[in-house]
Amino acid sequence: MSHVTTSQEMTEKSKEYFEKIVELTKKEGITLALISGPYLLEERDQEVYNSIGQLAEKDGLLFWNTNTPARYREMALDFSTDYADHAHLNEAGSAKYTAYLGKWLSKNYSFPDRRGQKGYESWENQLMKSGE
């Protein structure tokens, strides 16, 4: 859908909550990153994403759209095998997207290592369950 260059605003309610989230994160000193997960887009979806990109630019926010042919190739997503339906990745697709997102986050942000810290045991338990 990268050929779609027109924009369509999100619904009034969505825009209201978007603005509230932006305001709250700025007030709290939180860096907000807007990330669209991959799914099979309709033209209207891309128009809304174009509008979100414009709002993000206006507010100085990062908008990372993973719904582009180049990003699909980088993730090696196969629409015939990596989706459970038009809007949801299956387990294989989720693993590809999660790995891709993790690499991107690690490259663009710094996160403290919480391994072994009190209060983060559930993270380690989840990591052990996933076999990492």
Language model: regions and residue ranges:
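A short, structure-level motif marking secondary-structure boundaries and short turns
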Residues: T5-S7, S36-P38, H86-A87
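Secreted/periplasmic serine-hydrolase-like ester/acetyl group-modifying domain
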Residues: M1-E28, G116-E132
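C-terminal regions of proteins
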Residues: V48-G131
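Active-site segments of SGNH/GDSL-like serine hydrolases
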Residues: E19-D45
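Acidic-and-aromatic substrate-binding clefts and catalytic sites of carbohydrate-active enzymes
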Residues: E9-S14, L40-E47
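Serine/threonine-rich low-complexity intrinsically disordered regions
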Residues: T6, E42, D78-D82
